[in-house]
Regions:
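Short coil-to-helix segment of the ABC ATPase nucleotide-binding domain corresponding to the Q-loop/switch region
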Residues: 98-106
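A short, proline-enriched helix->beta-strand linker immediately N-terminal to the Walker B motif
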Residues: 158-162
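Catalytic Walker B motif of ABC-type/P-loop ATPase nucleotide-binding domains
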Residues: 164-167
């Protein structure tokens, strides 16, 4: 249904300063879809994420994200768009001098929550969703890497986002912890939020199939599923294993907006 379309890009050009990074980008993402974004470092993955987040301006084509027209969005509207988008980074970006509760409260205050009872209720709700209901009093350094990433996911869920952008969310985690994060992200998509995850980890794509978008040679193409619905390295000439590095790959060096735009 049209109303379920969270991302609708048609013939969009994506620039970094004066350099054309991706041309004629056409993407549709529906509510509840899980979409991988792959491609070599520097291929434009982070530039695409920045465009969806209105960090990079759209100057042509059609670009509707979470109900906002990015072609003519006003600067004062950008914070409201970003409240409908959650972002999860590879390197956590938690406030190290504040407790878990205070990290989440910081986001609530920055996005104009004011009712203390509602804030407390939502804080406990998102912590329970990520399996850390008893960790609110902890400082970030007292948590494992996987727990810190779960807190980042909880932070991204505070405003019930329509779209979750995950930029290498498992890049610093061991395989077992990565699996837990993947299961959580998949549960989020099943609950109705669209999820787009940039990754270099081929093993995750094999284990947790989803749609695949590939950035390559200035274009974004969709890699189709085979008849069984699984993705492999050999079913299509569009998917090459050199597009996916091993788990030690740290992903793109193009940063997304600091502090998730708050």
């Amino acid at each position: 249904m049209e109303s379920d379309k969270i991302v609708d890009l048609k013939d969009v050009s994506i620039f970094q300063k004066n350099s054309l990074i991706l041309s004629k980008v056409s993407i549709e993402i529906q509510s509840g879809e899980f979409v991988y974004l792959i491609g070599k470092t520097g291929s434009g993955k982070s530039s695409l994420l920045k465009t969806l987040y209105a960090e990079l301006s759209v100057i042509d084509g059609q670009a509707i994200v979470a109900g906002y027209n990015l072609l003519n969005i006003k600067q004062k509207e950008v914070p409201f768009l970003r409240r409908k988008i959650g972002i999860v980074f590879q390197d956590f970006q938690l406030l190290t001098d504040r407790s878990v509760d205070d990290n989440l409260m910081f986001v609530m205050k920055a996005t104009e929550w004011s009712d203390k009872a509602k804030m407390d209720a939502r804080l406990h709700e998102v912590l329970k969703m990520v399996g850390l209901a008893t960790k609110g009093h902890k400082m970030p350094h007292q948590l494992s890497g996987g727990e810190q990433q779960r807190i980042c996911i909880a932070r991204s869920l505070i405003n019930n986002p329509k779209l979750l952008l995950a930029d290498e969310p498992t890049g610093n985690l061991d395989p077992e912890t990565s699996a837990g994060i993947m299961m959580l992200l998949l549960e989020i998509s099943k609950s109705g939020s669209a999820v787009m995850m940039a990754t270099h980890n081929y093993n995750l794509i094999k284990q947790y199939p989803g749609r695949i978008l590939k950035c390559s040679n200035g274009k974004v193409m969709e890699i189709p599923a085979d008849l069984s619905g699984n993705f492999t390295s050999s079913f299509t000439p569009g998917f090459q294993t050199d597009d996916i590095d091993d788990e030690t790959d740290k992903g793109s060096n193009e940063p997304l907006p600091d502090k998730a735009g708050y």
